[in-house]
């Protein structure tokens, strides 16, 4: 396992403060600019390091609703679950509307929680993402930081970018694909999102950041 702690500590310091003045949290999305960029690993390590510095906790939202890989890594034993609705209409819905589904959070470490999407077998035919500004406002009021791990090759996640405080793109430094980065930046900005930065990730070597 690669220890990304020193690099992610530096990155969290660059994004200080983790929580905004007045007690309002932040919502940051990590998105790969292509396949195999390590975006999910960086999102998880960022959330873990940020949790150690937080007061009200950090939630890692895993948008891979089919496999829930982050929960399997951070909370492999399952354990107690918490409602992740924050008392608001969520950022997702299912078809048919009568299908039984919910999002919960499980404790993944000290002040760190990771989401898990649960569904009744065979009932959900389609899952959609949608803007939900009220939901994310409630998140900001309740916790210090939400880290949203978005599948980089999915266009569905663009429905959420306008509700984020920033989107951090992850690219492979060895083959960064400048055109792909710019295309993803344009798509995010066209939907009202803000690209807060680009991480050029190089596997076991230290990641490098660019504004």
Each language-model region and where it sits:
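C-terminal lobe/tail of nucleotide-utilizing enzymes
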Residues: 1-27, 48, 79-83, 182-211
């Amino acid at each position: 396992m690669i220890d990304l702690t020193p690099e992610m500590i530096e990155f969290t310091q660059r994004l200080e403060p983790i929580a905004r003045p007045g007690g309002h949290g932040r919502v940051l999305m990590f998105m790969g600019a292509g396949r195999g960029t390590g975006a999910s690993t960086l999102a998880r390590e960022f959330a873990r390091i940020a949790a150690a510095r937080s007061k009200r906790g950090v939630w890692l939202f895993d948008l891979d609703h089919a496999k829930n890989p982050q929960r399997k890594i951070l909370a492999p034993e399952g354990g107690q679950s918490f409602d992740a609705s924050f008392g608001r209409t969520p950022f997702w819905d299912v078809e048919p509307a009568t299908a039984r589904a919910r999002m919960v959070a499980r404790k993944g470490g000290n002040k760190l929680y990771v989401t898990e999407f649960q569904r009744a077998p065979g009932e959900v035919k389609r899952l959609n993402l949608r803007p939900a500004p009220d939901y994310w406002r409630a998140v900001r009021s309740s916790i210090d930081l939400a880290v949203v791990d978005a599948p980089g090759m999915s266009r569905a996640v663009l429905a959420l970018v306008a509700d984020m405080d920033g989107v951090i793109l992850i690219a492979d430094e060895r083959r960064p694909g400048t055109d792909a980065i710019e295309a993803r930046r344009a798509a995010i900005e066209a939907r009202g999102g803000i690209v807060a930065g680009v991480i050029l990730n190089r596997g076991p070597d230290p990641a490098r950041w660019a504004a």
